[in-house]
A protein has these predicted regions:
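Class I S-adenosyl-L-methionine-dependent methyltransferase catalytic core
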Residues: 1-150
Length: 150
């Protein structure tokens, strides 16, 4: 799934999702992080791990980035801060309505958002491929309708 894939790590934070994708074969990973200090540490991690040829850091607000983004990504990781419950819905809507989702969408969210996330999947014709839970955190791997036919 990740071999040579173009990936987007939205709300990158520590960058663990995007850098892991890069380390196991992604072709290119864009990491988006709005907090300056976090982005600075993320840039240092990319440099330390010699991932600069695969990873591109965008120090930007996720919503603004999605509004300007034109190219689709094979895999998109969305793990927004749980405190702002509107971020997840806004991001998924922007991704789907902007034609940015190529094949796979990975979401991490609080269990209290599960019904809202299910509604988003229905709204955009997406399919849940795999789900896990750890305490109150839900992790869902979602595929596009086209991908689920294979």
């Amino acid at each position: 799934m990740l071999q040579d894939a173009t990936c987007l790590d939205l709300f990158a934070g520590s960058g663990v999702l995007g850098m892991e994708a890069a380390s196991i074969g992604a072709g290119h990973v864009v990491l988006v992080e709005q907090h300056a200090e976090t982005a600075k540490h993320l840039a240092q991690s990319i440099d330390t791990l010699n991932l600069g040829n695969i990873c591109t850091l965008k120090a930007a607000d996720a919503r603004s980035f999605l509004e300007r983004c034109e190219a689709p990504f094979d895999v998109i990781f969305v793990d927004p801060p749980f405190a702002d419950t509107g971020l997840l819905e806004a991001a998924v809507n922007s991704i789907c309505e902007g034609g940015l989702l190529g094949q796979w969408l990975y979401l991490e969210f609080d269990q209290q958002q599960e019904a809202a996330v299910n509604a988003l999947l229905l709204k955009h014709g997406l399919s849940l491929a795999k789900s896990t839970k750890a305490g109150a955190t839900r992790s869902w791997l979602i595929q596009t309708a086209e991908q689920s036919k294979f």
